[in-house]
């Protein structure tokens, strides 16, 4: 098994309800270490760039508006097969289809306010981490 790093965003629906600690507890219970974390307000331009892959999708505008509606917590997680493990603890995008005990089943309000984002591949994780963190901020 390989030690990996992955990127996470706890979305405004989590920060607005003061659930950051509860979500972090699930992350750590899954065996992942939070090696970098900061609370930020992202700009519309940052949200559009981050989610550019979805720019042609009908939900793009709503996604961007949701992401800039309040603070987010950006994180770097580290552990054995971190990308796969975090995707499992996240749960399905649609919280109604997510397994019990996952972040989205326990905390998401809807598909649009689904509490968290996680990288889907090592290449994506590397790009997303570099977009939000300098190398000296990763203190695993």
Swiss-Prot record:
Belongs to the NDK family. Keywords: ATP-binding, Cytoplasm, Kinase, Magnesium, Metal-binding, Nucleotide metabolism, Nucleotide-binding, Phosphoprotein, Transferase. It holds the Pfam family NDK. SMART domains: NDK. It comes from the Bacteria. This is Nucleoside diphosphate kinase. Major role in the synthesis of nucleoside triphosphates other than ATP. The ATP gamma phosphate is transferred to the NDP beta phosphate via a ping-pong mechanism, using a phosphorylated active-site intermediate. ATP binds at residues 11, 59, 87, 93, 104, 114. It is found in: Cytoplasm. Disulfide bonds: none annotated. CDD domains: NDPk_I (cd04413). Its main location: cytoplasm. The active site is at 117 (pros-phosphohistidine intermediate). It catalyses: a 2'-deoxyribonucleoside 5'-diphosphate + ATP = a 2'-deoxyribonucleoside 5'-triphosphate + ADP; a ribonucleoside 5'-diphosphate + ATP = a ribonucleoside 5'-triphosphate + ADP. GO terms for biological process: CTP biosynthetic process; GTP biosynthetic process; UTP biosynthetic process. GO terms for cellular component: cytoplasm. Homotetramer. GO terms for molecular function: ATP binding; metal ion binding; nucleoside diphosphate kinase activity. PANTHER family: NUCLEOSIDE DIPHOSPHATE KINASE. PROSITE patterns: NDPK, NDPK_LIKE.
């Amino acid at each position: 098994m390989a030690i990996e790093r992955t990127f996470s965003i706890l979305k405004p629906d989590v920060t607005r309800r003061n659930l950051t600690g509860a979500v972090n507890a699930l992350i750590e219970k899954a065996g992942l270490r939070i090696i970098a974390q900061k609370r930020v307000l992202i700009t519309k331009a940052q949200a559009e760039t981050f989610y550019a892959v979805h720019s042609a999708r009908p939900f793009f505008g709503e996604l961007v508006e949701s992401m800039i509606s309040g603070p987010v917590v950006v994180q770097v997680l580290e552990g054995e097969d971190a990308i796969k493990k975090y995707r499992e603890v996240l749960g399905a995008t649609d919280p109604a289809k997510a397994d019990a005990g996952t972040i989205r089943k326990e905390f998401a309000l809807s598909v649009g306010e689904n509490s968290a984002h996680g990288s889907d591949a090592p290449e994506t994780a590397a790009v997303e981490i570099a977009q939000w963190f300098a190398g000296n901020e990763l203190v695993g």
